[in-house]
Amino acid sequence: MPESVPELKNCPQQSSAAEALLDGANAAQREAIAHYLGPMLVLAGPGSGKTFTMIRRIQYLIQVHGVSPSTILVITFTKAAATEMQNRFCQTATEVAGQPQFGTFHSIFFSIIQKHCHYKISDLVTPAQQRMFIKQVLLNGTYGLPIDLDTMENLVSFISRYKNLGEEQTGEGLLTQEQFKKFYLQYQEQMEWHHKIDFDDMLLLCRQVLQKQKEVRELWQERFPFILVDEFQDINPLQYEILQMLAGQENNLFVVGDDDQAIYGFRGSKPEILLQFPKEYPDAIQVQLSCNYRSGNAIVESAQQVIRVNQVRFPKELKANRTGGKVKLVTFETPKEEQEKILQYLKHGVARKEQCAILCRTNRELLEWAKECEKRGIAYQHKVREKSPWEESCGKDLLAYLRLGLGNGSREDLLRILNKPMRYLSRESVGAERIDFVSMLQFYEGKREMQKRCRQLEQDLNKVGKMPAFLAVSDICRRVGYERWMLEQCHDEKSRATLLQLLEVCKKAAMQCKTVAELLALAEKEGKDNSSGGEMKVVDSPLSLMTYHASKGLEFTTVFLPGLNEGKVPHGKNLTPKEMEEERRMFYVAMTRAKENLYLTYLQSETQNTSRISPFLKPLIEYL
């Protein structure tokens, strides 16, 4: 046992402190708070007081077990969560020397490589620098990709996923596996040349130094013999590997999480790590915080009916601390009726200062609700950027086609759509200054098939420019083959569903315009209206609009979950069992945000394409 871990001694002061720290806690919370040595897994359901339990456990270590505060490490997934926990500790802490180390995985791991690998804060690549390096690689290579914000964001995501998970198919949809490997090596060369590291490099370097340098590993094990981890269900394999090295043989790991709230699979999180924790640590004590202090009994029981359908989970029986709560399944004939009734309720709710929320699966659905609120003068807080469909990758492609069709497109527009769908036309065939199909034909002199493709592209663009707006967009999607090609680039059903939804929004916008020129003007206006950037729209209003993901950790008096029809919830079609379970967990998270009232609404009309009810509601129909 490290010297910094004191032995437990009994004295009146410790007994008094123990009683005070256990006061107000239920039996499960008491067991977690009083835990001292060895691993512990705390399964904390929604509203079960996990932060209260973690803070009390830290205080118990210090006041009862005599642990030095500076030897306690508390790891969270976001800076905001670390700050909140630190503030709550400081508000309740007694007069002690020092305090625990609160931080995110990235901040803790960077402090390690900062000390032992001699990296400085200035060595961290900024988002702008990272995109500059990617742009340089694309300019120097022959990847055939447009150099725009969408491409940059996708490649940043691919790089991160590759570093964390080692997935070699990361570039699917943009680059082949071989192209991605080449791109990745060139990107890393740029980073090394400028002596920069990104957030994912922090983890890789930290793992490397802890693996190879025993004295460094033991130094940090001695420094932090007690480790607490919040939201453990969101951990990825690389983070877990480093965490285990820090814990060492003592394994004083106190991990808190809920497998039923694991909703970040797209970021590389692996809830299986939490599920396997008792097997990896057979001596681990497992505690379930099963009392929900947030929601009324009806809401807690309804949420349990939904999540019990999942197979890969720890069995749990959550109970509400109080009776009451209201859950209503409401059917509407049309989307318009659904909007009218919900917003009518919310207008009165906002006037009463009642904390309300509309939670949707996707940002796209949220934006529709935001527009309807604005029409009616209902103030709201919006936790997503109001992004026009024309700012999405597919929207930008359509606009490029339309501008080229009218004859006022740029060289960048042509490069953007040159191989969407794939025409196997080289970027070198496009003139350096202006669009010139004659020059393109000359570039492919003697290659009849390639010249045929050039002529076909020119004809397609000319046709588009002469059509009404809606027909032009439909023609690009169907006859030209853009929609089919884009669907082929999607790697799963969720991506396909999102793409089709975006294209449908673009087509609806086109129906409002007569000419292509009018549609281009409309798209430009929407872009200017949304030019405030990625900041959250925050006003002094009790009404919040946010996605299921964004709502995690929050609570509201009244929650509306609209549009609960198959295809929307769950998002996508033909999902794998694993994907379906994560979708159900998202729905469960959204349900458990409600304290008093939960309204679940869906469409049921033979005239609606989305007439089938979400499968997630079926257990509730039988239960309610």
Task: Locate the predicted segments by residue.
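Helicase P-loop NTPase motor core
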Residues: V42, P46-M54, I58, P282-I285, ...
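Accessory C-terminal helicase-associated subdomains
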Residues: E445-A550, H571, N597-Y599
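SF2 helicase catalytic motif II
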Residues: W220-P237, F254
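ATPase/helicase motor core of nucleic-acid motors
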Residues: T323-G325, G349-A472
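A basic/glycine-biased coupling hinge at the interface between accessory DNA-binding modules
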Residues: P2-E19, L37-G38, P46-S48, Q59-L210, ...
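N-terminal pre-P-loop "Q-motif" helix
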Residues: L21-L37, L238
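Conserved RecA-like helicase ATPase core segment
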Residues: P2-K9, S16, L21, P237-F332
